[in-house]
């Protein structure tokens, strides 16, 4: 796997992926670039739900969303 720099499309897709989880009260539990796979078309796949939680409370989801946005703002590279 190679590393790619986060662009606007990837950032939007990562945030959307986490928002979809949170809409269903699912907390991923391990927000980090190693758990995000970027496809050639810049779509993303979240992996490693070992720490995931169903029916997460709202505060957990808000905190996780903040982590995701912080990671994206930092411009970290993610694997493809």
How should these model regions be labeled?
Residues 4-10, 22-28, 33-80:
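C-lobe/activation-segment region of protein kinase-like
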Residues 17-21:
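Conserved hydrophobic alpha-helix
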């Amino acid at each position: 796997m190679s590393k790619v720099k986060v662009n606007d499309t990837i950032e939007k897709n990562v945030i959307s992926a986490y928002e979809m989880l949170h809409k269903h009260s699912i907390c991923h539990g391990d927000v980090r670039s190693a758990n995000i796979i970027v496809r050639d078309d810049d779509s993303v796949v979240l992996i490693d739900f070992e720490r995931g939680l169903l029916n997460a409370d709202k505060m957990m989801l808000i905190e996780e969303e903040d982590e995701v946005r912080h990671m994206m703002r930092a411009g970290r590279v993610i694997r493809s």
